[in-house]
């Protein structure tokens, strides 16, 4: 959408919320305060959008960008709650035509109007706290049929959708790296949408990823946001940091007499940006040993159909953020076959991470961020139920 239509639509949505809520608050000072907050949120929106394209250079610009992004999260809750209120009042009015006096519409309108700012503020503050804290560790056992004994207990740590950019900087990334390094991983998988910005602006903030530790190294695949941010430059930068970037490629890891193929595809939408980089699970697997366990890193869950057809055993994805906050955790299901967790797709397992950071507004509500520790176990052994825990100390693993 072009800037002017986007601004016009945004203005109409803000005006709708202001009209429906402010007019129902029942006190002039409440209405004035609500309109002032709404106006501040609207006026700082351009700074939020600008920060997604280029790093703010001045402290005031950074403050305005933060204000715009927090305000965007607040407004999303205000809009949803206002629509729900109007639907509820409409239903109450219909009931009142059948049962006159059965519904106290005036009281309902007043109380619901006053509840909207309070609920939206609560959700936004709690969502901010959830987004800004370091992701908890989610532990998942993946049952694999005919798993070679040498791969029993193989540990994969997945991080995804960090979105280093306007509000996620080096300290946030350093905390993630420290948490991952305590998990004694065999392999670290970074499943795309690492950045929202150029190498020039963000290289210093991504640099801590070079300190990730595991036995077999760190592997990265592109997400759609890498293509918005200069994918070729980021692939070069990550390789410079010692991170293996898989572009429809694979490597073979050995454990005794067992092998595991670690393959990665470009983002599902990469072909729209560069036809030569179209996502291709079959090509990623070409030339791999046929008897090996096959693991695919694919940013979007909808790669699953092609991945299963190519013969993969397990796909690790992200992209969805689990919806990040209401109501998107319901709407994301319209675009992706899986939104979060371990799911079976025909003969293949798919694990979809809710993401380790966040995108846009610093807000997570109903979809907590995660660092995922996946453990391969034989299918005949009961898998442990997924659990959430803060990172725990573990023996140091040797470097990448």
Which residues are covered by each model-predicted region?
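Soluble catalytic domains of enzymes that build or remodel membrane lipids, polysaccharides, and related
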Residues: 138-139, 143-400
